């Protein structure tokens, strides 16, 4: 991946977090990047005397230190040196804060399995981090690998998606690989009642979005393959990713419908929840 020099890995000891750290280590080896691993423990707000524990703060902090020791062992096996940080508080707030304080370029987070609930909601921490940070976020499924052979950009031509386009082109140029790009015409039962002229305009708009990809790619000497699909955007994009065996999906944090800070755009959230490959979410 192009020019990420400071990487923050959120680590909670889960299998998905272990895989995220392993792949972040791969990225660090390739690009000589700097890694900080962050563990966040919750604050204790109850009655200390009821617990019968004399030093509850040390007990809570100890669990976080255990996580960081585990992370160091994993990083040692990967052959990379990491710095560590232990914070107490709301996980998403601390991840966003540390990424800003340390001037990180990229936040790496794991994504757990693909059960129905996990597909529907990718996790409040991940969603809130993406909703509140201005950093790029790489979300890595529990069993995914990281490679560059088949990069898929999802774009609707919005400003945020243009930033994702620029990042995807940087990656493709740096890695000397082609870039595939897809723009989706949203269709449902009501769509087919719009009339032929309206439908034609929507497809022409998707073509214009991809014309920008073609031009920017051509200016950088990057080979680009362009696709228009229709249907529910998250379904069309994830199906496209499966069809081309995508190794990475790149997209904006939100599209034309905007973004709420506590819940990212539903298309982005659903793609992260359903994709088999890592998803790079780019901000403005």
Residue ranges and their predicted role:
Residues 1-2, 23, 54-58, 62, ...:
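Structural beta-alpha unit
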Residues 3, 26, 30, 92-144, ...:
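Gly/Ser-rich helix-loop-strand patches that form or flank binding pockets
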Residues 20-23, 67, 94, 164, ...:
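Well-ordered alpha-helical segments embedded in enzymatic catalytic cores
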